[in-house]
A protein has these predicted regions:
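Short, Lys/Arg-rich flexible segments
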Residues: 1-149
Length: 149
């Protein structure tokens, strides 16, 4: 009789662990997806709301660039429109999120993010990630509370 009770308890505990793993896997995907969405949105907003230098103009449209150290000001909108994210799950169940520009040739987003020999950096992605830190913690706390039940 005692062995049957122990066996039932062990089986119940195994089911509980399997359920926790499923909830944790789902929570990991939810966290990465939610954070990537927010970083993408924040990067685009930074470009829209950045301070420009009224004393400098470029091009035929009279584009005013952003101040060095600020997110890049929108000129054509190509970079802003190219910012996207993706979330991948590998064969082991690990979830990885990517946020960035899909423009690769030339790597315009990287030139602005890190600067060039002739232009100081206009960080947009790293600034977006930094601005999202408290959001990331809030999402993590919310998900943890839900799955820890």
């Amino acid at each position: 009789m005692a062995n049957d009770d122990v066996t039932r308890q062990i089986e119940a505990f195994k089911r509980h662990l399997e359920d926790m793993k499923l909830r944790a896997d789902s929570a990991q995907y939810e966290f990465v997806t939610t954070v990537c969405n927010e970083v993408e949105r924040t990067a685009k907003t930074l470009m829209r709301d950045t301070e420009t230098n009224p004393d400098v103009t470029y091009g035929t449209k009279g584009h005013h660039p952003s101040m060095p150290g600020s997110a890049p000001a929108v000129d054509t909108g190509a970079l802003r429109q190219s910012i996207t994210h993706s979330v991948e799950v590998d064969s082991s169940g690990n979830v990885t999120g990517y946020v960035g520009s899909i423009i690769r040739n030339p790597p315009y987003g990287a030139y602005l993010e890190f600067g060039t020999s002739k232009m100081k950096p206009r960080p947009w992605l790293s600034t977006a990630v930094i601005k999202c830190r408290s959001f990331m913690q809030q999402v993590s706390d919310r998900i943890y509370k839900r799955i820890a039940k």
